[in-house]
Amino acid sequence: MEIFVRNKPYTGPVKAVVLDWAGTTVDFGCMAPVTAFIEAFALRGVEISASEVRGPMGLMKMDHVRALCGLPSVSERWRELFGRIPNEDDVRLVYGDTVPLMVLSVADHAELIPGLLPAIGYFRGNGIKIGTSTGYTTPMMEVLLPRAEKRGYRPDSVVCSSDVPRGRPFPFMCYRNAIDLEVYPLEAVVKIGDTVSDIREGLNAGMWTIGVSKSGSDLGLTEAELDALPADDLRNRLALVESRFLEAGAHFVVEHIGRCPEIIEEINDLLSQGEVP
C-alpha cells in the first residue's frame, strides 16, 4: 500500500467507491423496502402510503420504522385505532414484523440495475475498490448478496447498518468500508447512492458524493412505469430529485450508476488540482 502523509493535499486518484444497494445497484425504483414496510404496518391495521415510506428511505430499518411512526399522518391513524400515538414498544413490534417481510421482499427484488456491470468493469479496470453500505441488516443481505453475485455483482466489502453503532446519516458504515478496503484518505473515496441519507452519510464521512436520481427511491418508479411516463413529466420529476440531492450537498447527480465512471474522471481532475470534497 502506498503511504500518504497529510502534510500536503491528496491529488488523486480515486481509490474506492462505496455503493448503496436498493435503488442504486439493484432493485430499480427501490421497491423491496416499500412493499415490506407497507405490509408490516398493515399487520397492525395501519395503512401507510408508498410516499410516506419513501421519505426516510436509506435509514437503518429500525430508525426507518421509528421515523414512520413519528409522521403526524401515521401517528394519527395509529391513535384512531389504539387510542394513543405509537411508542418505542410499538416501534419494536412493527420492526419485528418488518424483518421477515423484508427478507422475502429483498429476494424478489434482486435484479441488477442497468449500467451497473459496465460501471463495475470500469472500477475494476482502474484499480478502484468497491465497498457497499446499506440500511439492510445482515440477515437481509445474506439473502440479497448471493442473488446479486449470480448476476455478476460481488463487491469487495459489504457493511450493513447492523454492523455499526449507528446507521445513516452517521458515517460509520463508510468508515468501516474504508478500513475493510484499506483505503485512505477519505477524499479518495466516492459515496454513491439514491437517497438524501446516502448523501449525508458520504458528506459526514468526508467523501465525494454522487446522487442517483432515475433508478432510485426519490423518483420511486419501476422501469415499466418509467417507460410509460410522458417525457416532459419525467424531466420535471428528475429535476426535482436532482434539486433535492444538490440541496442536501451532493457534489454530483447522475440518472443511473452507469454514468458514474465519467464523474469519477471528473473527480480525478478535481483532486489533481488540490480540490477536496
UniProtKB/Swiss-Prot annotation:
SUPFAM superfamilies linked: HAD-like
Disulfide bridges in this chain: none
Superkingdom per UniProt: Bacteria
The EC number(s) this enzyme carries: 3.11.1.1
List of residues binding Mg(2+): D20, A22, D194
Names of required cofactors: Mg(2+)
Cellular component per GO, a single term: cytosol
Keyword Zinc assigned: no
KW Magnesium (keyword) present: yes
Catalytic site positions: D20 (nucleophile), K61 (schiff-base intermediate with substrate)
Record keywords: Hydrolase, Magnesium, Metal-binding, Schiff base
Catalyses which reaction(s): phosphonoacetaldehyde + H2O = acetaldehyde + phosphate + H(+)
Main EC class the enzyme belongs to: hydrolase
Cofactor note: Binds 1 Mg(2+) ion per subunit.
Gene Ontology terms: biological process: DNA repair; organic phosphonate catabolic process
GO molecular function terms noted in the UniProt entry: metal ion binding; phosphoglycolate phosphatase activity; phosphonoacetaldehyde hydrolase activity
HAMAP family referenced in this protein's UniProt entry, alphabetically: PhnX
General function of this protein: Involved in phosphonate degradation.
Subunit structure: Homodimer.
Family: Belongs to the HAD-like hydrolase superfamily. PhnX family.
The protein's name in its UniProt record: Phosphonoacetaldehyde hydrolase
